Amino acid sequence: MFYLSTFMTIVISLSLVSCSYDCNNPGFTCHGECHYYGSCICNERLTGYDCSVLKSSLSTGSDCKVTCQNNGRCYDGNKCLCSSDYTGHLCEKQTTGARCTLDGVVFEAYRPIGFDGETYLSQSRSCKLLQSESDVPGMIKFERKIFHGDTSMCGLKKHMDMPNAGDITYEADIYSTFVYNSWGTRDFVDNVKCQYKPTRVGLSMDAPDSLFPIKMSARDGASSNVQATTQSAPISLLFSPQNIPDVKGAMVDYMEVYSINSTSKEYKSVVAVKNGCAQKTEYNVAFDNLDELDPVTSTWIGLVKMQAFIIFENEPLLFNYRLRFCPDRCSKPTCAAPAVSQAPSTAV
C-alpha cells in the first residue's frame, strides 16, 4: 500500500489478507450489497454473512426444534444459519477442515456451486483435494486422505507432545484458489490440524502471511525493499512464488490499483494489467508487465513497473491482483497497443 503524507512522500507497506468468504468470488452469493472488500452488507431486514435470512424468521427458545452448533443461529424453527466457516444442517462441518482417522487425516473442503478453482495442500498442486459425493445440499465437496506414514511430497507435518504431553498433532496448509492455475488476493489459505487425544478433533484456522504462495514487495532504484518515495518516482512491484516447489515462474495476469476515501467511503479504481497486458490509464501512469529471474531461487518472478501516483489525497494505494503460475518461465501474451481507459469506477 502506498501512503501519501502531507510532505508529498509516499510510504509503502505491503500485506496479504485471507478470509473464507468473499462475495466477489465465483459461486458465493450475496443477497445484500457486495462490498469491494468481499463482505456482504445487509439491509435492515436481512442477516447472515450472505444476507440470506430474514431477521423476522430467527427462532429462539422453545420455537427452535434443532440445536445449532459452532455459534449457528436457529431460524424457521428447524434450520441453522451458519457463519461462513461452517456448513451442514446443524453447522457441524467446517468449510475447510479434517476428519481424523486411526491411520490418516481426511482433508475436506466444501465450496459453493459455481466454484471452478483448486483446493490443494501447500506442498504441491499435485496434492489436490478431489471432488467427491457431497453430503451438504448446494455445496461441492472435495476431499483427500493422507496416511500418517506417507513419505511423498503430500506427507503431513507431525508434531509430538503438541499441544500437551502425549499428544500427536498432524497438520497441513490448504490453499484455495478461485481461478485455475493462479493465485489472487481474493483466494485464501487455511491451516488444518488433527490433534490425537482420547477423542480426535480436527481444527482449522487462518494461516499467517508467511504461508501464502506469493510474496509481494516493492523496490526503487536505490532500495530492494523501499519504504518511502516521492510522487511520480519509479516503483517496481515484485511478485515471488513461494512454498510451491513445482512452480518456477509467475507473471501478473491481472492487477487493479484502487484507493478508498476514508471520510466519504468512496472508492476509485483503475485496471493496470488485464489478461497479462499493461493498460493505459487516465492518470497518465505507464505500467510495464514483465518478469525477471531471481538468481537466489532460480525462479522467474512477476514484475510490474510503474510510477507512484495519487488517487485520493492522503489515502493509500491498494492492489488487487492475480498471478499466473508456470512450471518454468511464463510465456508472455501478445498485447495490442493500450487504449485510454474509461473514468475510474466509483462506489459508496
From Swiss-Prot:
Subcellular location: Secreted
Coiled-coil ranges from the UniProt annotation: none
Protein name in the entry: EGF-like domain containing protein 1
UniProt KW keywords: Disulfide bond, EGF-like domain, Secreted, Signal
Record domain ZP: where: 99-342
Tissue and organ expression note: Prismatic layer of shell (at protein level). Expressed primarily in the mantle with highest level in the mantle edge and lower level in the mantle pallium.
Ranges for domain EGF-like: 60-92
Cystine bridges: 64-74, 68-80, 82-91
InterPro entries for this protein: EGF-like_dom (IPR000742), ZP_dom (IPR001507)
Chief location of this protein within or outside the cell: secreted
